[in-house]
Amino acid sequence: MKGFDFRPKLFTMLRSYTKADLTTDLMAGIIVGIVALPLAIAFGIASGVSPEKGIITAIVAGFIISLLGGSKVQIGGPTGAFIVIIYGIIQQYGIEGLMVATMMAGVLLILLGIFKLGTVIKFIPYPIIIGFTSGIAVTIFTTQIADIFGLDFQGEKVPGDFIGKWLVYARHFDSVNWWNFLVSIISIFIIAITPKFSKKIPGSLVAIILVTVGIYLLKMYGGITCIDTIGDRFSIKAQLPDAAVPALDWEAIKNLFPVAITIAVLGAIESLLSAAVADGVIGDRHDSNTELVAQGIANFVSPIFGGIPATGAIARTMTNINNGGRSPIAGIVHAIVLLLILLFLMPLAKYIPMACLAGVLVIVSYNMSGWRVFKGLLKNPKADVVVLLITFFLTVIFDLTVAIEVGLVIACVLFMKRVMETTQISVITDEIDPNKESDLEVHEEHLIIPNGVEVYEINGPYFFGIATKFEEIMASLGDRPKIRIIRMRKVPFIDSTGIHNLTTLCEMSQKENIHIILSGVNPQVHNVLEKSGFYELLGKENICSNINEALEVARREIVELNKN
């Protein structure tokens, strides 16, 4: 494997950077910073942490991802996909457990990038991605029901699981605060209609400003005090916290490792998906492995300053592009804008109604659900539908860690099944049609297969599934031949089970006095078989470069056998 080449886009672009680029990046960065504010606050609160932690994540992680990332226009920060995971970790392990898990995920992301696995991440089956993003969307919506309806649980703790939440909601639904519900509906309505008037100004920002001002006036002059705001639940600190490294112990690392894998996998998928979408719009090509390393560093550093998991955010990245962002400078400016807001304007956030943020997250969950794509996938092959539904329901009913683990296992099994089905083994006992061949060196009369010889043509990878198929085909033929020619010109690779199968076949054949000849082995498979020691068992004189040579060896062997 060649050495890892870490090439952040920022440093490669600075050579040709102009004042015009700086002007557009400054404007785009300011707009994206303002757009990111309500989302960072909403994601922070929904994740079970204070609102400023969401902003700190957008500042620290957003800055690092832009500084070191492999995409020109990627904007990093907290996203809705992590809400479910973060909430569950905090409930089970507390804030310190979240810090450890996030830092571990950062290390895993760095390793994914260093070992050039960025491309592999892109091959995670689409039904799995849609299954768990749709499941996350349903879960996010579920977590917002309490704030949408202003439910009063009278001290009862709301459980973390999906079914438990709805049971608690049902028990306390008689405590609905219709003012809260009205605020949520108005917020959703404003977000929905804003794009009809302006594509550049985000509806979430418009909704938060208008609704916050409206509720403030109602509280001041209308005597309405039953609408909860951020300030009613959280004390907001307008400052960056001191750096602090969590205490580490082996037991915590073992317990949090599965969760860290989930954060890393989800972060890798979302960031690379966002970067790929951006590439399609701006006509560029991101560096997946550099991007993963940057994401890893961001997730390792962010918790030290009180942040939560972060990744590339598609909505903010597209906002950056639509407002003229041309380089990572726009992402750096976005982080600086958020820092200034945190230091000087954060006290105003206490007036934002919780029901308004719930409305913002309802829209986020709707957009994330991809219900049209989900519906379309239900028309696909049954195997894909099974993976989609299992991943979806596991995400909703259990948690994302279980969903990803089970979904990936099922997808791998189905993939191997499909590879098995595509690999064909045919048996030829009379003659080979020269018109269908590409490796023949002599003319047609030499293509007749002698009596007592069978040619097995393998078309596809020779791995553990095919080994079993090979054995079944040989058993079904009944009469034992004197010579078996195994033609492997269309075998791209062979695994350990395939080698074991060939070894067993060779040993069994020798006991039965059946001669084995290999034909047309490609260089890669040849090297694997040679290193495994298989050729010593078979004998190098029985390894032929093409079918002509193999048939010639078979004829000579038949003559010798007949003499004896």
Where is each model-derived feature located?
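Transmembrane helical cores of multi-pass ion-transport proteins
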Residues: M1-P434
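Short, contiguous clusters of charged residues that form electrostatic/catalytic patches at enzyme active sites
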Residues: A28, I188, A192, T468, ...
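Active-site-adjacent beta-strand anchor residues
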Residues: G76, G131, R487, L518-S519, ...
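Generic hydrophobic alpha-helical segments
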Residues: I86, W166, F470-M474, A550, ...
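Short beta-to-alpha loop/turn elements within the nucleotide-binding domains of ABC transporters
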Residues: F115, T497, S545
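The feature marks cytosolic C-terminal regulatory regions of anion transporters and related permeases
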Residues: N367-L537, R555-K563
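Short acidic-hydrophobic, aromatic-tinged amphipathic segments that line or gate anion-handling sites
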Residues: L537-V553
